[in-house]
Amino acid sequence: MENITLDELGNFTLTNLRKLAKEHKIEGYSTIPKMELLNRLCYSIATAEGLIYSYGELDIINETYGFLRNTPQNIDVYVSNSQIKKFGLRQGDVIVGEVRKPLNDEKNFGLLKLIYVNGEKGELSRQRPIFDDLTPSYPIERLELGEGTVSSRIIDLIAPIGKGQRGLIVAPPKAGKTTILSDLANDILKYNKDVQVWIILIDERPEEVTDIKENVKNAEIFAATFDENTSVHLSVTEKVLEAAKREIEKGNNIVILMDSLTRLARSYNIEMPSSGKLLSGGIDPKSLYMPKKFLGAARKIRGGGSLTILATALIETGSRMDEVIFEEFKGTGNMELVLDRALQQLRLFPAVDILKSGTRKEELLYSKREFDSILKLRKFLLKLNEAEALKFLMDLIKRYSSNKDLLENIDYELKL
């Protein structure tokens, strides 16, 4: 492909972009999302032509000027207030364009010519809808997990996840939440090609971050470990949320898996100025505002994309603060997956408390025939205790290759 201008790249299909990426020897081109591939190609082609191009996430300072962060050159690129207003730029936008070197006493490179915003031509950015003006609705399309791992299939039957779901994974220590999140991420990516998966790890151990990165290959992973300042925890979360909103405005489907909402609330409790009021456990009610705003951003947009958020909430940690945080978030989601450490101690994995887990308006996510079969299964499981119910369901799942086959044979299995 000869004599291609950077302005023309935006019209290329993903297949043609990959062919071009192969010519430019871009590593991993076959698995890179289209927007990221477009950005890398612009940078590669411009560099080959002797131009200075860059791309990065827009970080707007005090609602005036901004900087492109996380650029390939590891520099911050200044974006003027006039450029932000002209193109209607927003926090978290991914921008690619020509940049110039610092002039005179300037400290930073400057954005000279804006080419693309979030993978689309810059002049179209002003026409985007605003996230908060979009109409939310109940999730009506289920994420396909029915042929995945045992843990994903249990979730698909007991607490189905729709596009736009706002879910809590209620987890005591050592109940296997990290493994469940890894399985979920891999199965969502494998069986739902129109969905991007982002994982946020807040206040986690560094080795757990490494483990997630090694086990979940095609997800975007954002991490702030426990040895980093709490301000970093807040910054990472807020930037990811803004970037997700930009994707939803384009009509895309994003799934965010977060571990953990409890630790995020702790970090806000440290960083937020005191309101002079304290809840039991020493937590300032003001510090819960932003974590609630984060979880509340999950929604299905009527006639558009969706933002699905599944976040872990820690219980039985011995901390009164953690219990208060959980109580404050209880009921804010429309899906709950409850893990039980006693089940894990019985070597039952996933340690899902089937009787306490569920999804609101789940009938919207199943066909009528599927929902009738689910009701029969649930009524049967209610007659058993937690361990018996989980063991029965796991054995049932292992006899069928998919949940669809299982539900079609539910009358036979329950001897109805």
Swiss-Prot record:
Amino-acid positions noted as binding ATP in the UniProt annotation, renumbered to this chain: G162, K163, G164, Q165, R166, G167, K174, A175, G176, K177, T178, T179, R205
CDD domains for this protein: rho_factor_C
Keyword Nucleotide-binding annotated: yes
The enzyme's E.C. designation: 3.6.4.-
SUPFAM superfamilies on file: Nucleic acid-binding proteins (SSF50249), P-loop containing nucleoside triphosphate hydrolases (SSF52540)
GO biological process terms, semicolon-separated: DNA-templated transcription termination
All copies of domain Rho RNA-BD, residue ranges: 51-121
MF terms (GO), sorted A to Z: ATP binding; ATP hydrolysis activity; ATP-dependent activity, acting on RNA; helicase activity; RNA binding
Major enzyme class: hydrolase
Keywords, comma-separated and alphabetical: ATP-binding, Helicase, Hydrolase, Nucleotide-binding, RNA-binding, Transcription, Transcription regulation, Transcription termination
InterPro entries from the UniProt entry: AAA+_ATPase (IPR003593), ATPase_F1/V1/A1_a/bsu_nucl-bd (IPR000194), NA-bd_OB-fold (IPR012340), P-loop_NTPase (IPR027417), Rho_factor_ATP-bd (IPR041703), Rho_RNA-bd (IPR011113), Term_rho (IPR004665)
PANTHER family per UniProt: TRANSCRIPTION TERMINATION FACTOR RHO (PTHR46425:SF1)
Family per record: Belongs to the Rho family.
Task of the protein: Facilitates transcription termination by a mechanism that involves Rho binding to the nascent RNA, activation of Rho's RNA-dependent ATPase activity, and release of the mRNA from the DNA template.
Assembly, per entry: Homohexamer. The homohexamer assembles into an open ring structure.
Protein name: Transcription termination factor Rho
